[in-house]
Amino acid sequence: MAPLLGRRPFPLVKPLSEAATGEGEEEVYMIEHSKEAFRSREEYESRLERYAERIWTCKSTGSSQLTHKEAWDEEQEVAELLKEEFPVWYEKQVLEMVHHNTISLDKLVDQSWMEIMTKYADGEECDFEVGPEKYLRAKIVKVHPLEKEEQASEKKSEGSCDSPSSDKENSNKVAQDIQLKEESNRLESLSSLRESDRARRSPRKLPTSLKKEEKKWVPPKFLPHKYDVKLLNEDKVISFVPVDSLYRSERPPNKEILRYFIRHNALRIGTGENAPWVVEDELVKKYTLPSKFSDFLLDPHKYMTLNPSSATKRKSLGSPDQKPAKKSKKSPLSPSSWSLANLKKTAVNSSSSEEEMQLMIGANLNKKGSIGKKSDKKKPKNGKSQVLNGQKISAKTRSPKKGLKSPKLKQMTLLDMAKSTPKVSRAQKGGSNTPRSSSKPNKYLPPAALHLISYYRDNKNREDRKSALSALISKVARMLSAEDRKRLPDDLQELVQKRYELLEHRKQWAVMTEEQREEYMRKKREALKARIKEKTRERKQKEREERLEKQKRYEDQDLTGKSLPTFKLVDTPEGLPNALFGDVAMVIEFLSGYSDLLLPDGQYPVTAVSLMEALAAEKGGFMYLNRGLVVLLQTLLQDEIAEDYGELGMKLSEIPLTLHSASELVRLCLRKSDSPAGENESIEKGDEDSEGSAVYQDDEVEDEYLEKLETSEFFELTTEEKLHILAALCHRILMTYSVQDHVDAKQQRSGELWKERLAILKGENDKKRAAKQKRKEQGTVKPKEEVQAAKIVKKQEKINTQQDNDAEDMISAVKSRRLQAMQAKKEKEEHEKLTKERIERETEEERSRKQKASAEKAFHEGIAKAKLVLRRSPLGTDRNHNRYWLFSDEVPGLYIEKGWVHDSINYRFSPESKQDSEQDAEESEDANSSIGCPDDSTQREEKHAETTVPKQGQNLWFLCDTQKELDELLDSLHPQGFRESQLKERLQNRYQDIMHSIHLARKQNLGLKTCDGQQELLNFLRSDIIEVATRLQKGGLGYLDDTTEFEAKVRTFENLKDFGECIVFLQAAVIKKFLQGFMAPKQKKRKHQSEEAAAKAEEQDEEKKMAEEAKVASAVEKWKVAIRDAQTFSRMHVLLGMLDACIKWDMSSENARCKVCRKKGEDDKLILCDECNKAFHLFCLRPVLFNIPDGEWLCPACQPATARRSSRGRNYAEDSTQDEDEEEEEEESEEEEEEESDEEEEEQEMMGQRLRSRKAAKGKPGRPTRRGRPPKNNTHSRVSRQRYVEDTEADVEEMVRQSKPTSRRQNQEFQKCEEILAKLIKYRFSWPFREPFNADEIEDYTKVVTTPMDFQTMQSKCSCGSYQTVQEFLNDLKLVFGNTELYYEAGSSQLSCLEKTEQCARDLLGKHLPAHTYQRRHRKHQSPEPEPETANPGRGRKQKK
């Protein structure tokens, strides 16, 4: 085994024997891979040069243009593969077929593979079935031949092949029979596939084509041979075992392995099409392979001298006029030698009878169409037959004269006519076609040319006949003259003419000198360049024309192409028409696109399938539909456009929003104008606020739908009505300021991400440029470093030599050890330094990689979210103007919309003016967005190509939910259609997104949660009423002592009127002072005036008081009437929510917190003031109360001032004037009224019954006096009183401090102040302000700073409750920072900490106390005592950051 040189084996040099190599001391040269040994260096080098050339061919794989070593290694790899993959017992079976076979390699592989698959080999190990599911290991000992009938059929086919006059037709017939036999075996094997045939997988990777065949194709059926098998475990032989009882345990080799085996162990001798395969001699001897041909490899000239008659006979068969040729010497090689057949056996038995030979020859002549030609009937003299290129020729047909004798005529039978008629007609047709292209039809072409014509016609498309056809063309090109070449058929004439020119060129080349050859090659190269240039120009021109042609667009309906695939309708539940799927998709897309705004908590998304089921279900869809309504109403009611939405004098945003009140709130939001309560509000607010609710003509709901909602629940409406209301609600939300802000925020975020991305890219480019510049600089410095390194190395070598010379000296030894230790230490330090740098570099790279990945992820997410909030546009339209949609994951699949045009859409395809286009864009709901659309110029050019308009019709939706349908759609879209070209491009660009959506469409829907909507509303109404009653009773806000009977009574109610009476009863049971809103009694606190002034005021305000009471009574009466007239449970829920919102729940004892210690707990020791409802612990009061007093109890702040003065024996009114007292009393009353209004608003905002907090109103019209002038500070009154009474200063301060009650909002603000102070103390830059200054350490501090303050002191004041207002806390905070700025000089560390800490304080105050502003004047050496700063009342709405 060795690589081939070209197609021939190359002998290797034998390795020298050991004795020969041991005798002489001559140097031996050996090649490593082939182990060839040479004594001569010249031979060795010449052989190496030869082996290094790429002229070698691997014998096992056929790979050419390899070096000798590559081919050798490839052969070794194939040998190892065959050891693993090719069992030993198949070797003899395959090699017997290969040896001396003349067919091509592909056919040889197919035949040997079929032989292995249909027959067990001798020596093969298999499983022998001895019982049901019981097998024994056995070995094939003998293969019995088939039965007689099958043998006879085989002999018959072989005999026809062995005929000496067999021709192309016979060989084709044999090949067809074999092919039919293989196909029949394969078809039979499909039904008899055995389950027990276990496949042994190959360790090597097979081609993908074989893998695909294994999946689709079944191995052929075994032939019905019988076998003798020997059991491996026992020494027994069982004879005549049928093939059905044997099972192959190991998979036989595939065709690729067979191909490797045949190439590896056999070689094809010659290059002809019928060249034989010869197995290696070792394997021939090992398996005693029989030789099929005795004289197969004879020289052709010698063979022709022995068999001249064969050529004569073949020439006579090929003549067009069906006449025998006169002379055979004109053609030493017969044309029949080129029409060879693939035969299994070519040797003829010498004992064959004359009759058999005569019959076979006669049959072959009849098939050829030559009736009058028959070979001689006499037996050959020598009894042998000769072979030319694998074809049998009788030895008796030498004499041409005997072959020209006319045989006896016979009567033709019908069978003979049937066989000969098609062949004769074909021969006549071929003969008549030949002279058509000739200028002289009466003159015939030479026989070789005629044979070439027929051979070319039959074999021009066959790969295995190309070499024979090429040789025949060369022969005819040499033989024919120019005139004869012109008479050939056109296609053949061109081939012969080119071959003739090639042969003439070779002759001229042979007689040329070197100069002539160079000149000729130069001209030829120039001509070739010019031709290539011309061809390139023509090719570019053609490509340009093709490209321009492809860019042209035509009307889709004018083009002819594949028909579009038929899609199925979208599967909708019963009761939901297919035409409404578009509205369902619109609602789902809105919820999905604005999920960050509508569903900020990442709630479970609303899907199209579930929404359709909920719409189709009646009572079962209550939970799912109302959840969608709640999601939409949460955003709508908190927006500024819903500030004027009201009912019965209350804003809709203040009513609790639940699943049970959503239906009624939807009706109230979608009204064209608000109820009369809106008019009442407008009367209260004035002309400025009397606009009422906004009217939306574009997105309003029909009145009949809203009238139905008054008498029925939302889930009880029809499917179309529910969907129409959902769509209108989505359109209403699209007009809100929240949506506008959300879209702006997403677009702004997208722009910021683009800027960040560009900055990152710029930074990377800068780094690359810097690294490149650094490499250039290092490249210039490197040679100098190398010179220095070389000098150091030389010095080190000198030192080493000196050390070697003085090695005997002890001092030099010690020095060398020290030097070595120092050098080792230096190397270790250098190594550690390099390791540290490498670790730092790797860490930095990993950090930058993670940062880059996170930035890339954030960028793509931001861009995707920015696209989500824009209008969804279709992917495109097809030839029939059907639109194709790809929605979000909640609406999975590719959807096709048909009949989308209606009367309100003005579809145009001609150029139009700018104004018309803008008007159409406003009118059309389905106008395409600007994103993803082509340029205007291309649109104007392409608009001319569209000449059809979509037709109005029924709106239907279809679904493409399989990859096969999508591929068919892409294949059927025309690439030059105006609409379909764009659609195809977008579908291809988004192919992966569409496949992801199709995959999601296959997931099974979980279904809806079963519920009864009417029962749910009933149960929750009962529980809400009971909850309100219980809270009233526990909080002490009503006149309810025991609610047990009330609860039992409510649980039995089912009628709305009964529930209404319960709610009215609850309203009446609430203590009046704990009501607010439109139910609160309009009473003003009386001012402390003189008796005359009080009488006048009472007379003047009596009419106003009566009007206000009538007004309140009328509002409550309207509410009661609405309760009695309510027809739906959701309406009753809304009215109950109004009552809930009008109760001051923060006044409940459940939420009470001690005013002194501000702590809850110990309810048994907690007492409430009957005037201000503030809570106090008994042990927190001064003096302490040991028991809860009977009757009404007033806190110290609410007790009459005169009573307290008289009880303590103090008099403060003598020295004060009456005007000052009136001014102070008026100021206190105004502040109390303001606080009460603030408390009402705070209570409405802090309601715990809502799903989400409501947005506060922008302006508070009830506080004009507060905005008109700033409130007076309590310090003023305290100072004024100090001027008159100095000895009672402490009592006055305490009385004034307690005269102003602390509201719930202030309690919360004080808690926020404590949190802010705690965070400031923990802030790392606040160390200069945490503790008070030590006067001993810093002596001059008290001289500069008159009023010291620090965080620790502020914290103690907060814990003691010393701060009465947030402004006092802010003043102390400003004092801390002002003292630091006053004492320390510029540039000190304390001032730098001041800036950072003050900025931190500003951020915390803006976050936790946005209603209070922090402003401090930066002045040095000013009076540190702060003045109270009033909040700017006109600052308006806070801007967003």
Curated annotation (Swiss-Prot):
GO cellular component: nucleus; WICH complex
Cofactor dependency: Mn(2+)
Family note: Belongs to the WAL family. BAZ1B subfamily.
SUPFAM superfamilies (UniProt xref): Bromodomain, FYVE/PHD zinc finger
Protein's name according to its UniProt entry: Tyrosine-protein kinase BAZ1B
BP GO annotations: chromatin remodeling; DNA damage response; post-translational protein modification
Enzyme Commission designation: 2.7.10.2
Expression sites by tissue: Highly expressed in the neural tube.
Biased composition (Basic residues): 398-408, 1251-1270
Keywords: ATP-binding, Bromodomain, Coiled coil, DNA damage, Kinase, Metal-binding, Nucleotide-binding, Nucleus, Transcription, Transcription regulation, Transferase, Tyrosine-protein kinase, Zinc, Zinc-finger
Region (Disordered) location: 147-212, 307-338, 364-445, 531-555, 675-696, 766-785, 823-858, 911-949, 1204-1308, 1408-1441
Extent of Basic and acidic residues compositional bias: 147-171, 776-785, 824-858, 937-946
Zinc finger (PHD-type): 1151-1201
Catalytic activity, as annotated: L-tyrosyl-[protein] + ATP = O-phospho-L-tyrosyl-[protein] + ADP + H(+)
Subunit note: Interacts with smarca5/snf2h; the interaction is direct and forms the WICH complex. Component of the B-WICH complex.
Compositionally biased intervals (Polar residues): 386-397, 430-441, 1299-1308
Function: Atypical tyrosine-protein kinase that plays a central role in chromatin remodeling and acts as a transcription regulator. Involved in DNA damage response by phosphorylating 'Tyr-142' of histone H2AX (H2AXY142ph). H2AXY142ph plays a central role in DNA repair and acts as a mark that distinguishes between apoptotic and repair responses to genotoxic stress. Essential component of the WICH complex, a chromatin remodeling complex that mobilizes nucleosomes and reconfigures irregular chromatin to a regular nucleosomal array structure.
Pfam families: Bromodomain, PHD, WAC_Acf1_DNA_bd, WHIM1, WSD
